[in-house]
């Protein structure tokens, strides 16, 4: 039980450090926003709904395609590379934590993120990305996106069960809701 509690705390730290930001970046660029629009409704979920969503997402391949043209592609990729590079040490420290062997799906997510980081780092001039190369990177992002959403729902269920006072902030800053606002309203 204590090992799983520590593992859940590591996952929570991941979302605080980088996971929520990745979801926000990927979701804002996703051509298929409708495929995740139901994730705006999380304030109304109970444990049964979390379990239902986790079961649905376990092996799901969520519709995803970066819908950015021309010069904005390079800007998106440069910003993504900067984010990943700034969190590289954190990600490597996470993946070196032996407790993560207990959570194979999360380890797979970290490996996918580090792979994308490496792909972007090996491209010194992201302004020169061809459509074919961009499509390859889009595939890497899609792989991360599906895993990231599953782990995010798992994380929310954990917070809802063990730390319900913490989930309020997540709901107010929901990365799937472009109108989300951290401020508490009447």
Describe each PLM feature range.
Residues 2-87:
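Membrane-proximal, non-transmembrane interface segments of integral membrane proteins
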Residues 76-186:
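Soluble C-terminal extramembrane regulatory/interaction domains of multi-pass membrane proteins
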């Amino acid at each position: 039980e204590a090992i799983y509690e520590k593992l859940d705390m590591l996952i929570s730290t991941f979302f605080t450090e980088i996971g929520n930001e990745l979801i926000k970046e990927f979701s804002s660029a996703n051509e298929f926003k409708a495929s995740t629009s139901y994730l705006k409704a999380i304030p109304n979920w109970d444990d049964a709904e979390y379990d239902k969503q986790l079961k649905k997402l376990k092996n799901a391949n969520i519709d995803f395609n970066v819908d950015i043209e021309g010069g904005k592609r390079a800007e998106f990729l440069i910003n993504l590379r900067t984010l990943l590079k700034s969190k590289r040490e954190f990600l490597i420290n996470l993946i070196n934590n032996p407790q993560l062997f207990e959570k194979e799906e999360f380890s797979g997510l970290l490996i996918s993120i580090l792979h994308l980081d490496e792909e972007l780092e090996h491209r010194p001039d992201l302004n020169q990305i061809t459509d074919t190369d961009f499509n390859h990177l889009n595939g890497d992002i899609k792989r991360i996106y599906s895993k990231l959403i599953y782990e995010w729902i798992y994380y929310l269920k954990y917070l809802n069960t063990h730390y319900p006072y913490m989930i309020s902030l997540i709901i107010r800053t929901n990365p799937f809701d472009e109108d989300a606002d951290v401020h508490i309203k009447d």
